From Swiss-Prot:
Assembly with partners or alone: Forms a heterodimer with CpcU.
UniProt GO MF annotations: lyase activity
InterPro entries assigned: Calycin (IPR012674), CpcS/CpeS (IPR018536)
Lineage: Bacteria, Bacillati, Cyanobacteriota, Cyanophyceae, Oscillatoriophycideae
Entry protein name: Phycocyanobilin lyase subunit CpcS
Key word Lyase present: yes
Main EC class the enzyme belongs to: lyase
Organism: Picosynechococcus sp. (strain ATCC 27264 / PCC 7002 / PR-6) (Agmenellum quadruplicatum)
Top-level taxon in the UniProt lineage: Bacteria
One GO BP annotation of this record: protein-phycocyanobilin linkage
Enzyme Commission numbers on file: 4.-.-.-
Functional description taken from the UniProt entry: Attaches a phycocyanobilin (PCB) chromophore to 'Cys-82' of the C-phycocyanain beta subunit (PhcB) and the unique PCB that is attached to allophycocyanin alpha and beta subunits (ApcA and ApcB). In vitro, and probably also in vivo, chromophorylates ApcD and ApcF.
Family: Belongs to the CpcS/CpeS biliprotein lyase family.
Observed effect of gene inactivation: Cells are a yellow color, 70% reduction in phycobiliproteins, grow slowly, have an increased sensitivity to high light and a long lag phase. The C-phycocyanin beta subunit (PhcB) in this strain is missing the phycocyanobilin chromophore on 'Cys-82'.
Amino acid sequence: MQSFADAKEFFQYSAGQWQSRRVTHHLPFRRAESGGSNIQVETLEKDDPRIIEICQMHDMDASLSVGGSYVTWAGTMQWDKDDENHEGSTVFALIPDADNPRQGKLLRERGYAEIVPVAGEYHLDHEDGLVLTTEYETMTIYERFWFANPDLRLRTSTVKRFGGFNTTTFCMEERIQTSPVTATAAAETNPLYAISGW
């Protein structure tokens, strides 16, 4: 199991290209839907113009950010109609709490559920999983991310809307291309483990 000092390390470790497979359970309909996507994660330093811009967008002092990520995705879901697409991109900026680098605010230029700027709360739990809570106008999304091994990241999410749980999702994300930063981190953490192997 990977160990992280803070969320910045977690996102740096996530840098690279991922292939995601997921199953979403639509609880009111008692039906499940499968899907997949390709995800690209790029690490951004705190002085990156995109990080500064998103902090300004949220009226936050950019000097408080430790950096973040630029994420792009393209995918499909089983119930998609012809005119639906699941492509997009977003910038994450991390603002850790002053007294605890393992928790803080995660700023986005757009959310997944609503295409508006959104701020979530994050923390690393006792197993070094990243827990993210994001509140939108009509719903709250709870997510947990963790690494089963350096090339396999798992994610669960629950959407709560109008006082009840609407959907739950389980994702298995397999790394198909790493970044130099991630490869170095993996070699230091697991010197006998091949980053490209199982």
